[in-house]
Curated annotation (Swiss-Prot):
<keyword id="KW-0539">Nucleus</keyword>
<comment type="subunit">
    <text>Component of the Mediator complex.</text>
</comment>
<dbReference type="InterPro" id="IPR019145">
    <property type="entry name" value="Mediator_Med10"/>
</dbReference>
<dbReference type="GO" id="GO:0016592">
    <property type="term" value="C:mediator complex"/>
</dbReference>
<keyword id="KW-0010">Activator</keyword>
<comment type="function">
    <text>Component of the Mediator complex, a coactivator involved in the regulated transcription of nearly all RNA polymerase II-dependent genes. Mediator functions as a bridge to convey information from gene-specific regulatory proteins to the basal RNA polymerase II transcription machinery. Mediator is recruited to promoters by direct interactions with regulatory proteins and serves as a scaffold for the assembly of a functional preinitiation complex with RNA polymerase II and the general transcription factors.</text>
</comment>
<dbReference type="GO" id="GO:0003712">
    <property type="term" value="F:transcription coregulator activity"/>
</dbReference>
<keyword id="KW-0805">Transcription regulation</keyword>
<keyword id="KW-0804">Transcription</keyword>
<dbReference type="Pfam" id="PF09748">
    <property type="entry name" value="Med10"/>
</dbReference>
<dbReference type="GO" id="GO:0006357">
    <property type="term" value="P:regulation of transcription by RNA polymerase II"/>
</dbReference>
<protein>
    <recommendedName>
        <fullName>Mediator of RNA polymerase II transcription subunit 10</fullName>
    </recommendedName>
</protein>
<comment type="similarity">
    <text>Belongs to the Mediator complex subunit 10 family.</text>
</comment>
Length: 170
């Protein structure tokens, strides 16, 4: 999801209002840039420039007061926490969607690495258990018990824990 595609829900209403305010501010800054570029130094162009600056100041003031109004829960943005990395991306002139993509990629790599480790330990357990059973047949029951308890079956693990708890209580 990109930053421009917020679903319209009551919880997102303050964010949508703020996004609209920021879009209006950006548009006003662009218009101000055009006015500055085309300023000919005449009283009319200077007056238009002053009007645009005053409009921008009032927009910034309005955005600031509505974003921080503690009495209005619909516009208070303090409930929405923004990671400091995202703020750094924006300050550096980078797209915050890049942060999201990189964050997901890092987590996917980490998850893949952890899955590989888990599979490696599972193979080690199986091979080591087989070798132990071959060399020490008297340990076969204990090795099988360990293998059964460390399988991926969460329902089996839950039943073993329950059985163990029941045996300890009796």
């Amino acid at each position: 999801m990109t930053t421009g595609a917020l679903p319209s829900t009551p919880a997102n209403e303050p964010l949508i209002k703020s996004a609209d305010n920021v879009a209006n501010l950006i548009e006003s800054f662009i218009e101000l840039g055009v006015l500055v570029h085309d300023n000919q130094g005449t009283p009319q162009s200077n007056q238009a420039l002053m009007n645009k600056l005053n409009q921008l100041i009032s927009q910034l003031s309005q955005t600031s007061t509505t974003a921080n109004d503690p009495n209005d829960a619909n516009t208070n943005l303090k409930q929405f926490l923004i990671p400091i990395d995202v703020i750094s991306y924006i300050e550096d002139g980078r797209n915050p969607d890049i942060y999201t993509r990189e964050f997901i990629e890092v987590n996917a790599k980490s998850n893949a690495r952890l899955k590989g480790k888990m599979l490696g330990f599972k193979k080690l357990r199986d091979v080591f258990g087989d070798k132990l059973k071959q060399e020490f047949p008297q340990l076969e029951k204990g090795v099988d018990d360990i293998i059964n308890r460390t399988n991926d079956n969460s329902s089996h693990t839950a039943s073993v824990i329950t059985d163990t708890a029941n045996n300890n209580n009796s």
